[in-house]
Every structure is written in structure tokens, then in C-alpha cells.
Amino acid sequence: MIIKLSIEKGLSECTDFNKVLMFIQPLKLKLIETKTLEYLYSLISKKFKIKKSFLLYTEDGYAIPPSEEGSILKEIDKTFKVLKLNKVKKNEKTDDSGDDLMETDSDNKNKSSESDSSESDSSESESDSSESESESESNETSENESSSSSEPESSLAKKKLLIQQLKRDFQLKEKLQQEQQKQKEAQKPKEKPQQQQQQQQQQQQQQQQQQQQQQQQQQQQQQQKQKQKQQKQQIEQQHKKPPQQQQQQQQQQQQQQQQQQQQQQQQEEVPIGIDDVLTNFSYTISYDNIDELLVEEEKIKRKELEQKKRKLQSQLDNDGLANKNDNNSNNNNYNNSNNNDSNNNNTNKPLSKRQKKLLKKQQNSSQIKENYTINAINNKNDNSTNDSNNNNDNNNNNKNDTNDSNNDDNNNDKKKNNNYSTFKDLTIPNVNDKIAFQKHILLDYVLTVSEYLEGRIEKIDSDILYIRLEPGFDDFEFLDNEFFEESGALGVPVKSLISPKLISDNN
């Protein structure tokens, strides 16, 4: 049976396997570093599922054993031939065994029928097979000698060489197999005690793991029991609370409700200011309009302060001293009550930006009223000469107050209008650095007026700076309250700072 095989598609399947003979062109045998003949033998045995020994031959009839050094296979012809060999029975002649290797398919089919009968004797020992092979080879030599008259001498010489090579190859294979069996038998007793030790170690490890798991389960159960006990104790303690604690809780709840109501009232009373307009509609306002709003806001504030002072002075001049005392006392009590309420609110919760502004305005107005009432009482008890002096003193005090306020405004204006371009740009912020940054950092737009705030860095948390603002720079009209911490520091991301400057302590 002749089988044509393709290396690309893989070796074709066969149903009946004996010793395989393969013809390879001698031109395809070249030296290479990777693919050896051993690799080719193993590939054929795996693909054809051949467990018995076989040999490869060239077209000239030379055997190529796998152990031969120097003959290394680079590539095989895509259409090489594989022939099935017939085993030789004992004491039988094989006249056509060597000659029929290159014959037609019909001769090979006849030989395949003979190979079926020879498979029954394949289970004999290696010694018997070697004897039979030697006898068959001797028979083949005798037959070849008898047929030498018809064939040329060159073919006889080739056959003799083939027979000699076959003998050598089979002898080498038998020796290799015997050595491999000896090595396996020598390794078996050594492997057994090692396997026993490994099994014992594995059993010990499994036992240890089981013990650890049991201990963990016990610990978990104990922890769960302790938690349940603690929960029961807490529930019992809550039910057994004394009446004093209950009263305190009720009082605290009432105070919280009152504070919430007061905050709601204050928020309702406070009118909508420029801060709300800018924060809510900052994306629709142009730069020029914002500048005008800033200037107008400062003018309005100054006018309101002057009007309040004039009204207070006119009230003191026109009203009677008795009515002034009564009104002042009532106003003082009212202001004190408001101050107490506001202080309570401040202690409980941090004030918002608007509440701070209202408290400052109320405190300033109450202080001015108290000063005028005290002066009026002193004027009533003193003589007319003292009255005139007191009036002069009051006028001087009022002038001083206005001058002080004007001086404060001028100082603030100087600070705001400081030439910050002379300072260095802030590149790497550090704790305790004194810095200046633009006032409008928390809004979505950029002002053309270069207004700055000054402060000192208290803490740096990743990319957020916590800045303590310097006194005189506490005008938070363009800052969002959410960025202020409870400590009063301003938490600002570094990336949101616009043109920050590093101020040296000498300035």
C-alpha cells in the first residue's frame, strides 16, 4: 500500500500499522540546527500511532537511523512515499522483500496480505525476533546469490549493504532499550520512599489546615456571641435611661427646632444682594458691567453709612432726654437679646456669609446708639457749660469715627490697589508662605480690575490649599461660602488660583 502524504495538511490516517518505510530524496537532507531526525521519528510515531520500531530509507536504499549524527533534516518533499513492510516469519524465504520496495501498487497489496498473517507472531520475545531476522537475512542472501545471474552486480552490493545496516540499527536499538529499562528499574525503588514522604507531608498539611479552619470558626462564633451580648446590653441601657437624660434630650431637640426656625426667618428677611446675582448669573454678565457694579456697590455703602449717622444725630437733637433714655434702654435690651440669640446660633452652627454681614451691621449700629445715649445722660447731669463741652466732644468723636472709617477705607484701598506685579509668581506653595491671589477666583468669569486677597497658607492637602486671610482682606462678597472651613480657613484648589503671587515677609 502506497500512501502519499502532505506535510502542510498533516499525515493521513491509516487503519493497519506495522513497520513503516519512508523514502526521502537525498537532496532534501541538509544540515540545520533545529529539526533533527529524532524529531522526525517522533512526529511520525505520534501521527501514525506507531509504538513499534521503524526505520527511514532513502531512494537509494540507505537506512537513516535517528541516532545518526551529521544527517539532520531541514525539509521533506511535500509528496514523499510511505510503504508498509511485511514481517518475515521464521524459516521462510523473502526473495522479493528487498526487490519489491520500488515496485507497483499491486505487488505491495500482495505483501500487505502476507503481513496480516505475520501479525499473529508479533508478541514473541525480542531474542526470537532477532534470530528470525538473522535467519531471514541469511535466506535473503542465499536467494540473492541465486538470482545474481539475472541481476547486475551493483544491485547485489546495495542489498548487502542494506542488510548490514539493518543489523547494526536493530542491535543499537536493542541496546538502547535495555539501558532504558535498567535506568527505569533503578529509579523505581528511589521514587517510592520519596512518594511516601510527600504523601505524609501532604496529609499533615491537610490536617493542619483543617485544625486552623476549626479554630477560625470557633473564634467567629465567639465574636458573634459577644456582639449579640453587647447589643442586648445597649438596648437595655436605652430603656433604663433616667428621666434627667430624657429631659435633656427633649430640651436639645427644642433648641434645635428654634434655631432652625430663626435661621429660616433670617434668610427670608435678607434681601437678594449682588452676591446672589453674580453667583447665579455669572455666565451672563460682561466684564464692563461687573466693573461698574463693583464701583457702584462701594458708593452705595458709603452713602448708607452717612445717612444713618445723620439720622441718629437728628434724632438726638430733636427728641427729649427722657424719651431718649427710655428708647435707648429698650433698644439696648432688644439689641442685647438679638446679640444673645445670634451668639447662641454662632456657638451651635457656623454662620453664613450673609449672617456675618448682618451681625456686623447690627453691632456697629448698636455701638453708635450706646455712645450717644451715654453722652446724653452725662449731659443731663452736668451744667450748661459742660453740656456745650460735651456736645463739642461728641462732635469731635463723630468726626474721629468718620476719619477712622475713612482711614480704614483708604488703607484697604491701598492694600487692594497695591502693585502686586512686583511680587514673584507662586510656583511651588509651602506651609506658612504669605501669598496674594485675585479676589474672584471662585467665580466662572475673570475681572479686569486686579483685586487681590492676602493670606498665609496653614495647611496643604494634596492639591487643596487652606489659607488664613490677613486682617483687612475680609470682604468676602465674591467668594463662595462652601469653600470656607469651620476653622475659618479658605480651602481652595491650587489650579483655581488666578495669578497667585508669593509675598516676602519683608514687604
UniProtKB/Swiss-Prot annotation:
Annotated Low complexity bias: 144-155, 194-236, 243-255, 313-350, 378-409
Bias kind Acidic residues: ranges: 116-143
Renumbered residue ranges of the record's region Disordered: 91-162, 174-255, 309-422
Database matches in InterPro entries: Coilin_N
Basic residues: compositionally biased ranges: 351-360
Skewed-composition ranges (Basic and acidic residues): 174-193
Entry protein name: Putative uncharacterized protein DDB_G0274435
Lineage, opening ranks: Eukaryota, Amoebozoa, Evosea, Eumycetozoa, Dictyostelia
